[in-house]
Swiss-Prot record:
Main subcellular location: secreted
Classification of source organism: Eukaryota, Viridiplantae, Streptophyta, Embryophyta, Tracheophyta
Subcellular location: Secreted
Domain of life: Eukaryota
The protein's name in its UniProt record: Defensin-like protein 308
GO cellular component, one term: extracellular region
Keyword annotations from UniProtKB, A to Z: Antimicrobial, Disulfide bond, Fungicide, Plant defense, Secreted, Signal
Species this protein is from: Arabidopsis thaliana
Disulfide bonds: C31-C50, C37-C55, C41-C57
Length: 78
């Protein structure tokens, strides 16, 4: 009985420590607003989003050539 309790305790400790070593924490990316996400993302994202209390660290996608107005293009024909 003591050995099985000891074995379960060892497995519990190993599972917790392995997730800490690998940097996996399921509660760190929880957020209330974009300020919490700015701390969690650790990269420069102008205003990361907090969607369903989970941080979205992806930067906004750049506009494609079709989305850029013709007046904003710098190409000129001579």
């Amino acid at each position: 009985m003591k050995t099985s309790a000891f074995f379960i305790a060892v497995l519990l400790i190993l599972s917790c420590s392995s997730s800490m070593i690998m940097g996996v924490s399921y509660h760190e990316n929880r957020c209330h607003d974009w300020v919490d996400c700015a701390i969690w993302c650790k990269q420069w994202v102008p205003q990361p989003k907090c969607i369903n209390r989970v941080c979205d660290c992806k930067p906004k996608s750049l506009p494609t050539n079709d989305e850029i107005p013709k007046s904003a293009s710098s190409s000129s024909k001579n």
